[in-house]
């Protein structure tokens, strides 16, 4: 999958989960500090990433600091491809 498709797919998932388009315009926005993503949203995010991109990220191994901005999430998905 092309990087642009991954980026747009991840941003669409984040916008749907957070209810905010800010995630599409500020890719360094801290999703947890701003309250846009919580633990339940994190589980939903991981399920969506697995479903759409085949990314395996067990909740038990989830390190919030590695997944706290749209840019970091996009990079994780790209690495998994």
Curated annotation (Swiss-Prot):
Pathway: Cell wall biogenesis; lipoteichoic acid biosynthesis. InterPro entries: ACP-like_sf (IPR036736), DltC (IPR003230), PP-bd_ACP (IPR009081). One of its GO terms (cellular component) is cytoplasm. It is found in: Cytoplasm. Pfam families: PP-binding. GO terms for biological process: cell wall organization; lipoteichoic acid biosynthetic process. Keywords: Cell wall biogenesis/degradation, Cytoplasm, Phosphopantetheine, Phosphoprotein. SUPFAM superfamilies: ACP-like (SSF47336). The modification O-(pantetheine 4'-phosphoryl)serine is found at residue 39. The keyword Cell wall biogenesis/degradation applies. The keyword Hydrolase does not apply. Residues 1-81 form the Carrier domain. 4'-phosphopantetheine is transferred from CoA to a specific serine of apo-DCP. GO terms for molecular function: D-alanyl carrier activity. It comes from the Bacteria. Belongs to the DltC family. Carrier protein involved in the D-alanylation of lipoteichoic acid (LTA). The loading of thioester-linked D-alanine onto DltC is catalyzed by D-alanine--D-alanyl carrier protein ligase DltA. The DltC-carried D-alanyl group is further transferred to cell membrane phosphatidylglycerol (PG) by forming an ester bond, probably catalyzed by DltD. D-alanylation of LTA plays an important role in modulating the properties of the cell wall in Gram-positive bacteria, influencing the net charge of the cell wall. This is D-alanyl carrier protein. It comes from Lacticaseibacillus paracasei (strain ATCC 334 / BCRC 17002 / CCUG 31169 / CIP 107868 / KCTC 3260 / NRRL B-441) (Lactobacillus paracasei). The lineage of its organism: Bacteria, Bacillati, Bacillota, Bacilli, Lactobacillales.
């Amino acid at each position: 999958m092309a990087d642009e498709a991954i980026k747009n797919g991840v941003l669409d998932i984040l916008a749907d989960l957070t209810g905010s388009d800010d995630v599409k315009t500020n890719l360094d926005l801290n999703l947890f500090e701003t309250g846009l993503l919580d633990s339940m949203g994190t589980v939903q995010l991981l399920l969506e990433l697995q479903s759409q991109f085949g990314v395996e990220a067990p909740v038990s191994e989830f390190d919030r600091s590695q997944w706290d901005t749209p840019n970091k999430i996009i990079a994780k998905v790209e690495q998994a491809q």
